[in-house]
Structure formats: C-alpha cells, structure tokens
C-alpha cells in the first residue's frame, strides 16, 4: 500500500488528484500539502492528512510518490531546496523539455535543475509506456499535447503524413486554473467563444518536441476557450502521403490503439463528444480522410482535468508501481 503526497492540493488538478486517489485501492495514506486548502470539509476521510507546505520537509522521505500540482516554475522552486522525493510526478511544464534552454525560451524561467532532466520521462503512456515502467520521475503532459499527440500518433507511427499539421483546439475554462482572471469570470465566458495565445501558446513547442522523438511534422496550433467548465475537443487537419480512405484510417487507428484501455476509436461517420468523456480518463478519437484534398481530419475529445491532467498522472503512477493501468480510474462518464 502506498503513502502518497500532493503538493498544491487546492487547485482544480490537485482536487481531482485527491478525489481519485481517495478511492484508489492501493493508496493507504494521502498527504495534502497546501497553505490554503479551503475544501477540507469535502475530503473528510481517515486516509487523508491535510497539512501546510512547511511540513513537506519532515514527511517527504516517508512517501512512496509525490504529485506536484503547481504552476510553472513552482515545482523547480520547491525541489531546488534539495528535498527531492524517491519518486515524483510533476503536473507543471518544469520537466517536460529535455533541453533546459528550450524550457527557458518558452516559459521565461531559468531551469536550475538540468541534472534531473535526463532522469525524467514524459508521461504519455500510450506512446512512452516502456520508459514509464522504469521511471523515477515523470513529467505529466499538458492537456492540449495529450489530445493532439494521441490524435497524430497513429499517422506519424505509420509514416502516413508529412508537412504541416493544423491543430484547432478548444478547452473548457477549468484549463485556465482556479485563480480567476478576466477571461475566466462568468460574465466573459458565458455565451462567448474566443481564441487566445494565437500562434504562441506554450503547448505548441511541447507538442513539437514530442513529435521529434517519434517522427517529423510541423505544427500550427490555435487554442480557444469555450463556455463549458471541463472538457477538450481537438480538431486536427493534416496531409496524407497516400490515397487512403476513411475506412483505412479507422482500421489503422483501431490497430494502433487496440490494446489501450483508455482509448476509444469511433467509426468514421461519428464524432467524439465532450459530454461523453466528462469525468473519465478516456480519449475518444475519430479519423476521416478527405479524398478531394488528401487530408485527414482527426477529432479527439478528452476531459482536460482527468486524461489531460490528474487521471493520466495516476495512470502513470499505476505503471510506475506495476499496477493495472485502469486501477482507480475505471469510471464511466458524468453523462447525461
């Protein structure tokens, strides 16, 4: 049985980690490190110990794994004191780039722990499972990269695409985090739809960096906010090398993902729906081929807080410790 810590338990991702780990059959103790945990009444349980971050230095050596649910730069600040747990899974972008210079360019933060980067594995199980099995440290992917890479992977793996991929990505407002901003307040998000960080979103370099490990493709990425709380819908348009039908694509995607518990591949005429992945660790995908332009249209829906964050992190934990990947994650959507 595991003793698990969550640093930054009061944000949306930290709360999701807490909710899911609380019902995980292999988690015995759950330590929540937060300086302002206002939701303690929600999580009354003998499993849970709520404390402030200052006690981390006293407890971290006794924990089997620690989840860092902090903002960019904050995990670095936390770990740079030398208090590095035996295993950690980081939800921020602090360890997603192997090149510290690339991280500094994208996030404007100096990386002060380059010696750790070589030991960190990018935690997208459907692509890097074998590396995750022996990993000590995991960088959990961003939500947009998770959906985008799962959509592109079968084509890249089979060398079926080239050139430029257009990724048109829409996210619920929870992706912006719990701290309110002008864009996230109800009056601005309700009955509204807007793009943001056009052509300079920080997840674009992350997507491109991972693609370099498995193939080659340039990316044009435009994210948008939609008036829902949780959920992500990504539409990908990418050229095809050969004459391929929608049925061909369907069979290719099914073959690549046939053993993946959390990937659902739909027939060509179907579209994923945000509502049908809400509250799950699923990624639902459909792919179609347009014979006029020789482009593929790939559609992906995930819950940005679960498969795009907390659920995927727990999936990584399961792999790390040799548990079944679906352990503690086998729930159905919040539907209707």
Swiss-Prot record:
Its main location: cytoplasm. One of its GO terms (biological process) is L-arginine biosynthetic process. It is found in: Cytoplasm. Its EC number is 1.2.1.38. Keywords: Amino-acid biosynthesis, Arginine biosynthesis, Cytoplasm, NADP, Oxidoreductase. GO terms for molecular function: N-acetyl-gamma-glutamyl-phosphate reductase activity; NAD binding; NADP+ binding. It comes from the Bacteria. SUPFAM superfamilies: Glyceraldehyde-3-phosphate dehydrogenase-like, C-terminal domain, NAD(P)-binding Rossmann-fold domains. Pathway: Amino-acid biosynthesis; L-arginine biosynthesis; N(2)-acetyl-L-ornithine from L-glutamate: step 3/4. Disulfide bonds: none annotated. Pfam families: Semialdhyde_dh, Semialdhyde_dhC_1. One of its GO terms (cellular component) is cytoplasm. It is an enzyme of class 1 (oxidoreductase). SMART domains: Semialdhyde_dh. Catalyzes the NADPH-dependent reduction of N-acetyl-5-glutamyl phosphate to yield N-acetyl-L-glutamate 5-semialdehyde. Belongs to the NAGSA dehydrogenase family. Type 1 subfamily. This is N-acetyl-gamma-glutamyl-phosphate reductase. It comes from Dictyoglomus turgidum (strain DSM 6724 / Z-1310).
């Amino acid at each position: 049985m595991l003793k698990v810590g969550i640093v930054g338990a009061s944000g949306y991702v930290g709360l999701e980690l807490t909710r899911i780990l609380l019902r995980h059959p292999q988690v015995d103790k759950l330590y929540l490190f937060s300086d302002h945990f206002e939701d303690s009444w929600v999580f009354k349980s003998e499993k849970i110990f709520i404390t402030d971050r200052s006690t981390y230095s006293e407890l971290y050596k006794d924990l089997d794994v620690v989840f860092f649910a902090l903002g960019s730069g904050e995990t670095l600040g936390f770990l740079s004191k030398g208090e590095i747990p035996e295993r950690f899974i980081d939800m921020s972008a602090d360890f997603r780039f192997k090149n510290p210079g690339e991280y500094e360019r994208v996030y404007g933060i100096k990386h002060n722990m380059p010696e750790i980067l070589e030991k960190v594995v990018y935690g997208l199980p459907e692509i890097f499972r074998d590396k995750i099995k022996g990993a000590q440290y995991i960088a959990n992917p961003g939500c947009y990269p998770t959906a985008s890479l799962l959509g592109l992977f079968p084509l890249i793996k089979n060398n079926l695409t080239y050139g430029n991929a257009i990724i048109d990505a829409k996210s619920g407002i929870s992706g912006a985090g719990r701290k309110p901003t002008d864009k996230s307040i109800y009056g601005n998000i309700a009955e509204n739809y807007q793009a943001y960080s056009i052509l300079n979103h920080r997840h674009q370099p992350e997507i491109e960096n991972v693609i370099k490990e498995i193939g080659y493709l340039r990316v044009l990425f435009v994210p948008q906010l939609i008036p829902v709380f949780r959920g992500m819908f990504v539409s990908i348009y990418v050229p095809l090398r050969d004459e391929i039908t929608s049925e061909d694509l369907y069979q290719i995607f099914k073959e690549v993902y046939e053993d993946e518990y959390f990937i659902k591949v739909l027939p060509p005429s179907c579209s994923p729906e945000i509502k049908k992945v809400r509250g799950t660790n699923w990624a639902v995908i459909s792919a179609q081929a347009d014979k006029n332009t020789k482009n593929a249209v790939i559609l992906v829906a995930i819950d940005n807080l679960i498969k795009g964050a907390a659920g995927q992190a727990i999936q990584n934990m399961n792999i790390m410790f040799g548990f079944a990947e679906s352990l503690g994650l086998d729930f159905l959507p919040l539907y209707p």
